Amino acid sequence: MAKAKFERLKPHVNVGTIGHVDHGKTTLTAAIATVAAITSGGEAKDYASIDSAPEEKARGITINTSHVEYDTPSRHYAHVDCPGHADYVKNMITGAAQMDGAILVVSATDGPMPQTREHILLSRQVGVPYIVVFMNKCDVVDDEELLELVEMEVRELLSDYDFPGDDTPIIHGSATEALKGSQEKYGQPAVVELLNVLDTYIPEPERDIDKAFLMPIEDVFSISGRGTVVTGRVESGIVRVGDEIEIVGIRDTQKTTCTGVEMFRKLLDEGRAGENCGVLLRGTKREDVQRGQVLAKPGSITPHTKFDAEVYVLSKEEGGRHTPFLNGYRPQFYFRTTDVTGAIQLQDGTEMVMPGDNVEMGVELIHPIAMDKGLRFAIREGGRTVGAGVVANVLN
């Protein structure tokens, strides 16, 4: 079977459903795919095919995730849906499925529940920039005032976590009715409205190539007569011959100039996001650069030792620790291409962290690493992964 050609004609946006168990995330995912297939072509998906989420691995952690694609007239969407709460936690922390926006599903019969709150908090911590709300099961609520009450609660909850609760689009509907093909206001028209809201409320994400240049250094070579070459995969932006660049992390930041870009032994004028290349550095000695540092556009990223993080700790069954860890625990933190030792500061009131938990913590590294909010890392102990995390706030 030939692979379908990926058409890059429309902007591509990543979204996902979040919310409490049994509030209708998977049913809504099926309804969106079905309605989008009717309005813009594409493949309708039924509940069963989305619910049987295949396993995948991200940073050594097994996660069950369903990927669904659909189109609106102006955009192409990739949508993730997870079967269980633990899968959401892992997915969001590892960044296995980075979301440009999330669809929060809240049952009108229950209102916000504990996982509703937790998913909003996680969205804030891991940097999901936009949330839209689908109030589900509205067809079984007779009392209009109750719907207004639930909507108010949801808006307050969003505002509690620094999302613009008052301005967030909230759509009332019924995923089940939409899947049945109902043309009543809570049926397919509500899902059409949701698709319009996704198009208008979630801005088009900035492409990696349009961001500032950043390349994690994987290897360093010395080429006689030409100088020092560092190799790696360009994470974002473009580096051109003649550009001033900084070497950031582990040691004091150094300035240098790119005097050449090589790929597959060919000389190029530039290296772009997604490409593996070698960058020739003017006047930089081989011993001044090491794996774990990054090349970056001057001033675009700074090195830090202290940060707050949201962390998922692997369970024993996932190959993680068998015992909890306490305050002051000192594992290795694996950022991009290297391990750095760091000490953990648990929040007041948290005595220990059990395998399988997700937790907020402070970290202090022994060497500074180039980092920004949203950077993912693994926590390792003797070479095996025991956790995954994301930088929630950079401190110093």
From Swiss-Prot:
Annotated localization: Cytoplasm
Region G4, annotated ranges: 136-139
GO molecular function, one term: guanosine tetraphosphate binding
Top-level EC class: hydrolase
UniProt record similarity statement: Belongs to the TRAFAC class translation factor GTPase superfamily. Classic translation factor GTPase family. EF-Tu/EF-1A subfamily.
Subunit organization: Monomer.
G2 as annotated region, ranges: 60-64
Domain tr-type G as annotated: residue spans: 10-206
CDD domains, per database record: EF_Tu, EFTU_II, EFTU_III
Keywords carried by this UniProt record: Cytoplasm, Elongation factor, GTP-binding, Hydrolase, Magnesium, Metal-binding, Nucleotide-binding, Protein biosynthesis
Gene Ontology cellular-component terms listed: cytosol
Entry keyword annotation includes Transferase: no
PANTHER family noted in UniProt: ELONGATION FACTOR TU, MITOCHONDRIAL, ELONGATION FACTOR TU-RELATED
Gene3D superfamilies documented for this protein: P-loop containing nucleotide triphosphate hydrolases (3.40.50.300), Translation factors (2.40.30.10)
Matching NCBIfam families: EF-Tu, PRK00049.1, PRK12735.1, PRK12736.1, small_GTP
Organism: Psychrobacter cryohalolentis (strain ATCC BAA-1226 / DSM 17306 / VKM B-2378 / K5)
Catalytic activity: GTP + H2O = GDP + phosphate + H(+)
Protein name: Elongation factor Tu
InterPro entries to which the protein is assigned, alphabetical: EF-Tu_GTP-bd (IPR041709), EF-Tu_GTPase (IPR050055), EFTu-like_2 (IPR004161), EFTU_2 (IPR033720), G_TR_CS (IPR031157), P-loop_NTPase (IPR027417), Small_GTP-bd (IPR005225), T_Tr_GTP-bd_dom (IPR000795)
Superkingdom of origin: Bacteria
Stretches for region G1: 19-26
Binding site for Mg(2+): 26
Spans annotated as G3: 81-84
